[in-house]
Amino acid sequence: MFHFLALTPLAHSEGFGLNTNILETNILNLAAVFALLAYVGTDFVSSLLKTRKESILKSLRDADERYQDAVNQLKQALQELETARTNAAEIRRQSEINAEAIRQRLELLTQEEMARLEEAKETIIKLEEEKAVAEVCTKVISMALVRAEKKIISSMDEAMHRRVMDMYLNLLREVY
């Protein structure tokens, strides 16, 4: 409505009325609208800009807060990772030390067992040799005694034969 109303007096002193000249009315109307907007709109636009600025600043603060939280979580995760790596390295080192100690202990036990088995083998061989020598000696002595007995029997009379037999029997009794 205001666009077509002009506050200019009419040429024929008719009073106030409708001005249909577009060039005159537009400039005046635009000036009035701009003045009204400048007076009323500054507070409104200023309020809108202030609200928008506060909203943007709040969003930036929230984003910065989330960024700081993410950075802190990353730092904590990196510290935990480093701690885990350190623990893993320590466990690996201890495992290697334990494995080496077990290997050395097993090697020592194996050497001791081999020495014990070698000693047992030597003892068994020696005992078997002694047993074989004793058996051979017993057989040789038995055969020699049988041969000597046959020789003596063939060359002796009965009295001599009894004395020799008694003597050998006494010797055998003393030995066994």
From Swiss-Prot:
GO cellular component entries: chloroplast thylakoid membrane; proton-transporting ATP synthase complex
Recorded topology in the membrane: Single-pass membrane protein
Transmembrane segments: 27-49
Annotated compartments: Plastid, Chloroplast thylakoid membrane
One Gene Ontology molecular-function label: proton-transporting ATP synthase activity, rotational mechanism
UniProt keyword annotation of Protease present: no
Transport recorded as keyword: yes
UniProt KW keywords: ATP synthesis, ATP-binding, CF(0), Chloroplast, Hydrogen ion transport, Ion transport, Membrane, Nucleotide-binding, Plastid, Thylakoid, Transmembrane, Transmembrane helix, Transport
InterPro entries (alphabetical): ATP_synth_b/b'su_bac/chlpt
Pfam families: ATP-synt_B
Protein task: F(1)F(0) ATP synthase produces ATP from ADP in the presence of a proton or sodium gradient. F-type ATPases consist of two structural domains, F(1) containing the extramembraneous catalytic core and F(0) containing the membrane proton channel, linked together by a central stalk and a peripheral stalk. During catalysis, ATP synthesis in the catalytic domain of F(1) is coupled via a rotary mechanism of the central stalk subunits to proton translocation.
Subunit structure: F-type ATPases have 2 components, F(1) - the catalytic core - and F(0) - the membrane proton channel. F(1) has five subunits: alpha(3), beta(3), gamma(1), delta(1), epsilon(1). F(0) has four main subunits: a(1), b(1), b'(1) and c(10-14). The alpha and beta chains form an alternating ring which encloses part of the gamma chain. F(1) is attached to F(0) by a central stalk formed by the gamma and epsilon chains, while a peripheral stalk is formed by the delta, b and b' chains.
PANTHER family reported in the protein's UniProt record: ATP SYNTHASE SUBUNIT B, CHLOROPLASTIC (PTHR34264:SF3)
Similarity comment text for this entry: Belongs to the ATPase B chain family.
Misc: In plastids the F-type ATPase is also known as CF(1)CF(0).
Protein name: ATP synthase subunit b, chloroplastic
Organism encoding this protein: Nephroselmis olivacea (Green alga)
